[in-house]
Amino acid sequence: MSYFLVNEALPKDMRAALARYGECISLPPFDKLPHPVNKHPDMLMMQIGETVFVHREYEAGQRILERLGVPYHLSEKAVGENYPADVALNCFAAGGYFFGKLSATSEEVKAYAKEQGLVLQSVSQGYTKCSCAVAGRAVVTADVGIFRAAKEAGLSVLLVPPRHIGIEMYDAGFLGGASVTLDEKTLGFFGDLGRHPAGEEIRAFFEEAGINVVCLSGDPLFDYGGAIKID
Protein backbone atom coordinates (compact mmCIF):
# COMPACT_ATOMS: atom_id res chain seq x y z
CA MET A 1 0.00 0.00 0.00
CA SER A 2 1.33 3.43 -0.96
CA TYR A 3 0.55 6.65 0.91
CA PHE A 4 0.72 10.31 -0.03
CA LEU A 5 1.35 12.78 2.78
CA VAL A 6 -0.36 15.89 1.47
CA ASN A 7 -1.34 19.47 2.27
CA GLU A 8 -4.56 19.43 4.29
CA ALA A 9 -5.97 22.00 1.81
CA LEU A 10 -5.64 19.65 -1.18
CA PRO A 11 -9.09 19.58 -2.88
CA LYS A 12 -11.30 16.49 -2.90
CA ASP A 13 -11.09 16.00 -6.67
CA MET A 14 -7.30 15.84 -6.57
CA ARG A 15 -7.40 13.48 -3.59
CA ALA A 16 -9.75 11.24 -5.55
CA ALA A 17 -7.35 11.27 -8.52
CA LEU A 18 -4.42 10.46 -6.22
CA ALA A 19 -6.39 7.59 -4.65
CA ARG A 20 -5.73 5.51 -7.77
CA TYR A 21 -2.07 5.46 -6.73
CA GLY A 22 -2.31 5.41 -2.92
CA GLU A 23 -4.09 6.70 0.16
CA CYS A 24 -3.91 10.42 0.99
CA ILE A 25 -3.06 11.46 4.54
CA SER A 26 -3.15 15.15 5.48
CA LEU A 27 -0.15 16.69 7.23
CA PRO A 28 -1.10 19.07 10.07
CA PRO A 29 0.40 22.58 10.00
CA PHE A 30 3.76 23.17 11.73
CA ASP A 31 3.58 26.39 13.74
CA LYS A 32 7.32 27.13 13.45
CA LEU A 33 6.86 27.82 9.72
CA PRO A 34 4.93 30.74 8.16
CA HIS A 35 1.31 30.36 7.11
CA PRO A 36 0.23 29.02 4.62
CA VAL A 37 3.38 27.06 3.67
CA ASN A 38 3.42 25.55 7.17
CA LYS A 39 1.25 22.80 5.72
CA HIS A 40 3.28 22.26 2.54
CA PRO A 41 4.88 18.79 2.50
CA ASP A 42 8.03 20.10 0.77
CA MET A 43 8.58 22.43 3.75
CA LEU A 44 7.84 19.78 6.38
CA MET A 45 9.74 16.70 5.23
CA MET A 46 12.14 15.52 2.53
CA GLN A 47 13.23 12.20 1.06
CA ILE A 48 16.41 10.74 -0.33
CA GLY A 49 15.26 7.50 -1.90
CA GLU A 50 13.02 5.83 0.68
CA THR A 51 14.66 7.65 3.61
CA VAL A 52 12.49 10.36 5.18
CA PHE A 53 13.74 13.38 7.13
CA VAL A 54 11.46 15.46 9.35
CA HIS A 55 11.98 18.51 11.58
CA ARG A 56 12.68 17.51 15.21
CA GLU A 57 9.99 19.86 16.50
CA TYR A 58 7.37 18.69 13.99
CA GLU A 59 5.98 16.02 16.31
CA ALA A 60 2.61 15.75 14.55
CA GLY A 61 4.39 14.64 11.37
CA GLN A 62 6.53 12.20 13.32
CA ARG A 63 3.42 10.59 14.82
CA ILE A 64 1.96 10.06 11.35
CA LEU A 65 5.16 8.36 10.17
CA GLU A 66 5.20 6.18 13.29
CA ARG A 67 1.57 5.18 12.76
CA LEU A 68 2.45 4.10 9.22
CA GLY A 69 5.49 2.19 10.47
CA VAL A 70 7.84 4.41 8.48
CA PRO A 71 11.34 4.89 9.96
CA TYR A 72 12.61 8.46 9.78
CA HIS A 73 15.57 10.69 10.60
CA LEU A 74 15.35 13.95 12.52
CA SER A 75 16.65 17.28 11.28
CA GLU A 76 18.07 19.19 14.24
CA LYS A 77 18.37 22.56 12.48
CA ALA A 78 16.38 25.33 14.12
CA VAL A 79 13.30 26.29 12.11
CA GLY A 80 11.93 29.82 11.83
CA GLU A 81 9.32 31.81 9.96
CA ASN A 82 11.82 33.99 8.11
CA TYR A 83 13.86 32.91 5.09
CA PRO A 84 16.24 31.08 5.04
CA ALA A 85 15.36 29.55 8.44
CA ASP A 86 12.36 27.88 6.78
CA VAL A 87 14.20 25.90 4.06
CA ALA A 88 16.24 23.30 5.99
CA LEU A 89 14.45 20.43 4.21
CA ASN A 90 13.70 22.16 0.90
CA CYS A 91 16.21 20.22 -1.18
CA PHE A 92 16.30 17.19 -3.48
CA ALA A 93 18.46 14.45 -4.96
CA ALA A 94 18.59 13.52 -8.64
CA GLY A 95 21.04 11.72 -10.89
CA GLY A 96 23.72 11.26 -8.24
CA TYR A 97 23.59 14.90 -7.13
CA PHE A 98 22.05 16.67 -4.16
CA PHE A 99 20.74 20.21 -4.69
CA GLY A 100 19.94 22.82 -2.06
CA LYS A 101 20.97 26.11 -0.52
CA LEU A 102 23.63 24.27 1.48
CA SER A 103 24.25 27.04 4.01
CA ALA A 104 20.60 26.68 5.10
CA THR A 105 20.18 22.92 4.61
CA SER A 106 19.88 20.45 7.49
CA GLU A 107 23.29 19.09 8.55
CA GLU A 108 21.77 15.62 9.01
CA VAL A 109 20.42 15.63 5.46
CA LYS A 110 23.76 16.77 4.00
CA ALA A 111 25.65 14.12 5.98
CA TYR A 112 23.28 11.39 4.79
CA ALA A 113 23.52 12.59 1.18
CA LYS A 114 27.32 12.34 1.38
CA GLU A 115 27.07 8.84 2.90
CA GLN A 116 24.96 7.81 -0.09
CA GLY A 117 27.68 9.03 -2.44
CA LEU A 118 25.74 12.03 -3.71
CA VAL A 119 27.63 15.10 -4.92
CA LEU A 120 26.45 18.17 -3.02
CA GLN A 121 25.60 21.12 -5.26
CA SER A 122 24.74 24.46 -3.67
CA VAL A 123 22.29 26.85 -5.35
CA SER A 124 21.13 30.35 -4.42
CA GLN A 125 17.43 29.49 -4.42
CA GLY A 126 16.53 28.29 -0.93
CA TYR A 127 13.19 26.92 -2.07
CA THR A 128 15.06 24.38 -4.16
CA LYS A 129 12.60 21.49 -4.07
CA CYS A 130 9.62 23.83 -4.43
CA SER A 131 11.19 25.19 -7.61
CA CYS A 132 11.64 21.90 -9.48
CA ALA A 133 9.45 19.19 -10.96
CA VAL A 134 11.73 16.15 -10.81
CA ALA A 135 11.45 12.63 -12.20
CA GLY A 136 14.55 10.45 -12.38
CA ARG A 137 17.30 12.51 -14.03
CA ALA A 138 14.80 14.94 -15.59
CA VAL A 139 14.31 18.35 -13.98
CA VAL A 140 12.03 21.25 -14.97
CA THR A 141 12.45 24.62 -13.28
CA ALA A 142 11.90 28.35 -13.76
CA ASP A 143 14.98 29.14 -11.66
CA VAL A 144 18.01 30.03 -13.78
CA GLY A 145 20.53 29.16 -11.06
CA ILE A 146 19.11 25.68 -10.54
CA PHE A 147 18.87 25.21 -14.31
CA ARG A 148 22.58 25.97 -14.71
CA ALA A 149 23.60 23.77 -11.76
CA ALA A 150 21.54 20.82 -13.00
CA LYS A 151 22.86 21.25 -16.54
CA GLU A 152 26.46 21.33 -15.28
CA ALA A 153 25.72 18.13 -13.35
CA GLY A 154 24.76 16.43 -16.61
CA LEU A 155 21.07 16.12 -15.85
CA SER A 156 18.34 16.54 -18.42
CA VAL A 157 16.89 19.94 -17.58
CA LEU A 158 14.28 22.31 -19.03
CA LEU A 159 13.98 26.02 -18.19
CA VAL A 160 10.43 27.39 -18.30
CA PRO A 161 8.90 30.85 -17.69
CA PRO A 162 8.26 31.81 -14.04
CA ARG A 163 4.82 32.42 -12.51
CA HIS A 164 1.58 31.01 -14.03
CA ILE A 165 1.10 28.78 -10.94
CA GLY A 166 -1.35 29.60 -8.17
CA ILE A 167 -0.62 29.50 -4.45
CA GLU A 168 -2.44 30.60 -1.31
CA MET A 169 -1.61 34.18 -0.19
CA TYR A 170 1.46 34.69 -2.43
CA ASP A 171 1.75 36.17 -5.93
CA ALA A 172 2.91 32.96 -7.62
CA GLY A 173 3.68 29.37 -6.76
CA PHE A 174 6.41 26.99 -7.87
CA LEU A 175 6.26 24.11 -10.36
CA GLY A 176 7.75 21.61 -7.90
CA GLY A 177 5.03 22.41 -5.39
CA ALA A 178 2.46 21.77 -8.12
CA SER A 179 3.82 18.28 -8.86
CA VAL A 180 3.94 14.87 -7.20
CA THR A 181 5.71 11.58 -7.95
CA LEU A 182 2.98 8.99 -8.53
CA ASP A 183 5.28 6.08 -9.27
CA GLU A 184 8.74 5.46 -10.71
CA LYS A 185 7.63 6.36 -14.22
CA THR A 186 4.71 8.74 -13.58
CA LEU A 187 4.62 12.38 -12.50
CA GLY A 188 1.38 14.04 -11.47
CA PHE A 189 0.46 17.73 -11.53
CA PHE A 190 -1.97 19.56 -9.27
CA GLY A 191 -3.99 21.00 -12.13
CA ASP A 192 -4.04 20.97 -15.91
CA LEU A 193 -0.56 21.24 -17.39
CA GLY A 194 -2.13 22.35 -20.67
CA ARG A 195 -3.16 25.64 -19.02
CA HIS A 196 0.47 26.58 -18.35
CA PRO A 197 2.16 28.50 -21.23
CA ALA A 198 4.96 25.91 -21.35
CA GLY A 199 2.66 22.99 -20.54
CA GLU A 200 3.03 21.08 -23.79
CA GLU A 201 6.80 21.61 -23.75
CA ILE A 202 6.96 20.26 -20.18
CA ARG A 203 4.87 17.23 -21.10
CA ALA A 204 7.00 16.47 -24.17
CA PHE A 205 10.20 16.89 -22.12
CA PHE A 206 9.15 14.34 -19.50
CA GLU A 207 7.72 11.93 -22.05
CA GLU A 208 11.01 12.01 -23.96
CA ALA A 209 12.67 11.03 -20.66
CA GLY A 210 10.29 8.05 -20.38
CA ILE A 211 8.05 9.68 -17.76
CA ASN A 212 4.26 9.61 -18.04
CA VAL A 213 2.47 12.83 -17.09
CA VAL A 214 -0.90 12.84 -15.31
CA CYS A 215 -3.00 15.95 -14.64
CA LEU A 216 -4.93 15.54 -11.38
CA SER A 217 -7.61 18.13 -12.21
CA GLY A 218 -8.75 20.45 -14.97
CA ASP A 219 -7.99 23.60 -12.98
CA PRO A 220 -4.95 25.86 -13.47
CA LEU A 221 -1.78 24.55 -11.81
CA PHE A 222 -1.63 25.22 -8.07
CA ASP A 223 1.23 24.90 -5.61
CA TYR A 224 0.17 22.71 -2.67
CA GLY A 225 3.75 21.89 -1.71
CA GLY A 226 3.94 18.60 -3.57
CA ALA A 227 3.56 15.41 -1.53
CA ILE A 228 5.67 12.86 0.32
CA LYS A 229 5.13 9.40 -1.21
CA ILE A 230 5.52 6.44 1.11
CA ASP A 231 5.68 2.93 -0.39
Locate each region found by the language model.
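Histidine/cysteine-enriched polar flanking segments
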Residues: M1-D231
